[in-house]
């Protein structure tokens, strides 16, 4: 009886699910969310931590950091008690990367804006390095028009979302980006699905890159953005 064989060896081994959810660092292929079974669309990266502790940056990495943000540049923010906290931009940049690697399941509530002259390598760390480390399916490079689009479900299935070549100084752009930065949850629209709208938990960190000095308008008191120094060629564009 083929039906009995299928029921015993197939259906019982692959439980029915109500759809998919993107759940980084959940190593179960089938997982439960609020009592409902979902298939986890997150793909575990090939590269895993070794446990080794390095007390200093590799020379090539330090050279790269010096290109996109000089060592002497600081960043700062004010806390709820109005006290000011200062860090080196390179240190904060690495902390942003570390948070994406070590705790991708936790939402990142600060967006990074990397500005620089064309060809300075400001996108190399994301397009080449991070894509390999976090997994190709966990990184997405998009344009601002993709974010403005009606169907944005796929943008939430990522650990690092990179909006490339942004340059739009209209005030409404920051309002469009706001839901992609701070909230833990956001409503998404899926194309060609029965449940086109759903509430989803945001896991990605947001990065914007641009060749322009002021790619978007940000209020002086807005603490949602990390804006390091504008990178320039150290000698000439051909270097």
Where in the sequence are the language-model features?
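Conserved AAA+/SF3 P-loop NTPase catalytic/coupling segment centered on the Walker-B
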Residues: 158-183, 215-222
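Intein modules and their embedded homing endonuclease domains
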Residues: 1-51
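A short helix-turn-beta junction within AAA+ P-loop NTPase domains corresponding to the substrate/partner-engaging
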Residues: 216-235
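P-loop NTPase catalytic core of nucleic-acid-dependent motor ATPases
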Residues: 29-160, 226
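AAA+/SF3 P-loop NTPase mechanochemical coupling elements
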Residues: 151-156, 190-209
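Conserved nucleotide-state-sensing and coupling region of NTP-binding domains
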Residues: 111, 168, 194-198
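Conserved catalytic/switch belt of AAA+ P-loop NTPases
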Residues: 134, 174-198
């Amino acid at each position: 009886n083929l039906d009995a064989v299928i029921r015993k060896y197939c259906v019982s081994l692959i439980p029915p699910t109500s759809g998919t959810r993107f759940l980084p660092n959940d190593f179960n292929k089938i997982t439960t969310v609020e009592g409902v079974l979902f298939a986890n669309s997150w793909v575990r990266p090939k590269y895993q931590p070794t446990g080794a502790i390095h007390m200093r940056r590799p020379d090539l990495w330090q050279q790269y950091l010096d290109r996109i943000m000089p060592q002497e540049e600081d960043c700062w923010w004010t806390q709820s008690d109005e006290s000011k906290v200062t860090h080196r931009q390179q240190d904060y940049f690495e902390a942003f990367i570390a948070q994406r690697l070590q705790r991708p399941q936790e939402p990142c509530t600060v967006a990074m804006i990397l500005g620089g002259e064309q060809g300075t390598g400001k996108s190399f760390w994301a397009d080449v390095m991070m894509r390999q480390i976090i997994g190709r399916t966990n990184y997405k490079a998009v344009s601002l028009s993709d974010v403005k689009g009606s169907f944005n479900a796929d943008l939430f299935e990522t650990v690092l979302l990179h909006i490339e070549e942004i340059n739009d100084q209209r005030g409404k752009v920051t309002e469009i980006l706001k839901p992609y930065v701070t909230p833990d949850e956001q409503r998404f629209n899926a194309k060609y699905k029965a449940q086109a709208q759903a509430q989803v938990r945001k896991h990605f960190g947001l990065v914007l890159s641009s060749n322009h000095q002021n790619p978007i308008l940000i209020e002086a008191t807005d603490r949602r953005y990390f804006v390091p120094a504008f990178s320039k060629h150290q000698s000439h564009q051909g270097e």
